[in-house]
Amino acid sequence: ADQAADYEIIYGMCPPQELKAAANLKWLCCSFAGVDAYTDETIYPNPDVLLSNSSGAYGITISEHILMVTLMMLRQMPKFEEIVKNREWEKGLSMRSICGSSITVLGTGDIGTNFARRAKALGAKVIRGVRRTKKAGDPAYDEMYTFEELDSVLPKTEILVMALPATKETNHILSRERIAL
């Protein structure tokens, strides 16, 4: 905090309550997309501080990670590893595939769309996008819905991917009740 007074640029994640100490701050570049916590000008030492986010920087990397985790869940990887470790070859596992599945992508920005493209390439039966507006999205999406329509989409969903920025609108968008739909 003592050095913060000298900072002109901060990149990464800085607690909003600590920004006032950066008296010379000119630019706060967040290493994530959702910057709602940083939009109140009163948290800065002066109103001229430039705020930017990193929207679009992680689409490929994070979507590939989501794809990997999705496949691990569909193929019951932790159980499979246990079978291999214990040499219990006679045990079989039911494994599911992305091919032929119904996927809902909650958040159709860079990360969500990169995931949808990859899932489409693997043969997903239908990919639904859910976002603020219903405007046409990337061709990877077969159907597009708004956040207000989420409850009607979830019952048709086999795989749900959340790729949302941290904003007031998206905070707590899912609940046990909603997931149970």
Ranges and model annotations:
Residues 10, 28, 66, 103-107, ...:
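Generic structural signal for small/hydrophobic residues in well-ordered secondary structure
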Residues 119:
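Aromatic pocket-lining residues of Rossmann-like dinucleotide-binding sites
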Residues 5-8, 22-25, 123, 141-142, ...:
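Short, well-ordered alpha-helix to beta-strand connector turns
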Residues 6-84:
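Phosphate/diphosphate ligand-binding glycine-rich loop within oxidoreductases
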Residues 1, 8-13, 83-91, 139-147, ...:
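Short gly/ser/thr-rich secondary-structure transition/capping motifs
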Residues 133-181:
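Rossmann-like adenosine-cofactor binding region
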Residues 2-5, 19-22, 98, 152-157, ...:
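A short, aliphatic-rich alpha-helical micro-motif
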Residues 48-50, 80-114, 143:
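Glycine-rich NAD(P)-binding loop of Rossmann-like domains
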